[in-house]
C-alpha cells in the first residue's frame, strides 16, 4: 500500500515550491519520498523527479505540430497520458514503499471542466495507492473579497469533481499582509465563516458592484455545501509544515499504517485534540502585523514544540 499527495491549484500558487519543500521536510524526518512531475509544461523543476511526464510526451513539440495554444497543448498532453497509463503504472509500482508527491499542472479547467485528472487518479487508486488531494492557493487572494470567493468556488468544484480526500491550503502565509492588512482575522478565511460579512466589502468597490448579486449567489452555494476550509502554510516554517502533514496523514490513512493495537488509535485521537486547540492562533499572531495583541512575540524556531510533532511523524 502506497501513500501520497496530489498537489493541484492555479498557476502561481506555489505548487512546485510546495512539492520541493514538502519532499525535503519528509526526507528529513526519515521518509522515503518520490516526486512525480505530471506537468508537461513545467520548465524549471527544482527537484529531481522520480517520474517525469516529459519523458512520455514533449509539450513544446505538441504545441508546434498541432498549432494548439498553451492550454490546448496541455490538455492534449494529459489526454495522451490518460491513454498511456500502462507507462505510468510501470513507473509507479516500484515506488510503493515511497511516499509519493504528484506535482500536477496548474490549469484550473483540468479539474473543473474535464475528467482527465480524475480518471488518472481513479486508476492510480486501483494500483493500491492512498492519496490526498492538496489544493494550494496563494494567501494573497484573501486580500480581495471577490478573489476570495473565486478560490472558494474553485476549491468546491475540485472537491466535488475529484472524489478523494481534500485539504485546501493557503500558501505564502509569511507574505499574507504584504499588500496591507486583511479585513478579518485568519479564522474567517481558514474556517470560511459567515460569508455574509463580505457583502459590505463587495459593495464598496464600484467595479464589483454590478457583480454583487452574482458574488452573493456564489457565496450562498459555497455555504450550502459547507465543505470548504483551509489550512495556512508557510513552507519555510517547519512547525507550519508539520501541522499540515498531521492533517494529511490522517486523511489518507498514513497515520494508522504503523498501528499495532487498537489502543494506539485512542492515543492518536487524544494527541489530535490537543493539537487542534486554537490551531491557527499562533499563525495569526506570527504573520498578522495588524493582529490586536501586539505584545505577543513568537520565535521562528520552536524546537521543543517541533520535537513533539517529530515523534508523531516518525511513527
From Swiss-Prot:
Residues under site feature: Stabilizes the phosphate intermediate: 71
Annotated positions binding GTP: 12-17, 171-174
SUPFAM superfamilies the record matches: P-loop containing nucleoside triphosphate hydrolases
Entry annotated with the keyword Disulfide bond: no
UniProtKB keywords: GTP-binding, Hydrolase, Nucleotide-binding
Motif Gly-Pro-Asn (GPN)-loop, chain ranges: 69-71
One Pfam family in the UniProt entry: ATP_bind_1
GO MF terms, alphabetically ordered: GTP binding; GTPase activity
Gene3D superfamilies (UniProt xref): P-loop containing nucleotide triphosphate hydrolases (3.40.50.300)
Superkingdom in the source lineage: Eukaryota
Biological function: Small GTPase required for proper localization of RNA polymerase II and III (RNAPII and RNAPIII). May act at an RNAP assembly step prior to nuclear import.
Entry similarity comment: Belongs to the GPN-loop GTPase family.
Assembly and oligomerization: Heterodimers with gpn1 or gpn3. Binds to RNA polymerase II (RNAPII).
Cited PANTHER family: GPN-LOOP GTPASE 2, XPA-BINDING PROTEIN 1-RELATED
Listed name of the protein: GPN-loop GTPase 2 homolog
Taxonomy of the source species: Eukaryota, Amoebozoa, Evosea, Eumycetozoa, Dictyostelia
Gene for this chain: gpn2
